[in-house]
Amino acid sequence: VLAIFAVAGALMLGTAPAYAGGGGGGSSSSYTCKGGDIPSGTYKNVTISGPCTVAAGSVITITGNVIVNKGAMLDAQSAPATITIAQNVTALPGAFLGLGCQPPSYTGNSAHPCAVDPEGHSSISVGGNLTTAGTSTVMLNGITVARNVTLAGGNGGPIPWSVKNNKIGGNVTAIGVNASWFGVLFNEIGKNVVLSHIALDDHDPGAPGVYIVRNKIGQNLICSNLTVLGVAGVTGYGNAISGKTLGQCAGI
């Protein structure tokens, strides 16, 4: 067990992304959204400070970073849009972060249809890291992240947390998340998946806990302290894992 935690700790220390600073280039200016749709256009950095959305068919290019401030909302999972972020995405405590939507006909599985246009699909890419800290809800569906996805803490309430149908070049790490449901499904992940201290309060009879289903994982899958209503709970099947399965996920 100690060896498992040592491996997980080494992975997290070696790959945890730093918070984004200023960046980008060109003549575009930065943009702060305090509510409503983010207009199509090119921006240096984007700061989300209120309940912000994207319109169906919008095309947004960000040459730097996106920051979702405390208690703010970035809903880019309800309407199909094209969003290109050159650097990092960071969501702060109490924020809502939803990126990506597609119909089942596009993904070949249950997918995450766009509420505004159920047959439409988004195209969202992040050139750096995606990091959340104490975020209320995270929904990542069919996006591309070049480096790492790190979900540190958070209380999701009744909204499920999903990491689904994504292409992630680095590691996926989720630690200290409290939610009704948490799933890592149908992803292509270049390096490791580390899941630890995820507590679910799913009251459905026979709730199986954290879902880890049909992922392609380039290195290792490491799990510990995954619970549903205080009882150990994890369900995994159909995964292609190039490395080892360790801890609570051994043998998945």
Question: PLM features: residue spans?
Answer:
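N-terminal export and membrane-targeting signals
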Residues: 1-6
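C-terminal region of N-terminal signal peptides and the immediate post-cleavage residues
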Residues: 9-32
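Short, low-complexity, Pro/Ser/Thr/Gly-rich segments in the mature regions of secreted, periplasmic
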Residues: 22-27, 238-252
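Short, ordered "entry" segments at domain starts
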Residues: 26-73, 77-82, 87, 110-111, ...
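Feature marks extracellular polysaccharide-active and adherence modules
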Residues: 49, 55, 63, 69, ...
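Acidic/polar low-complexity surface segments
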Residues: 94-122, 150-163, 183, 195-207, ...
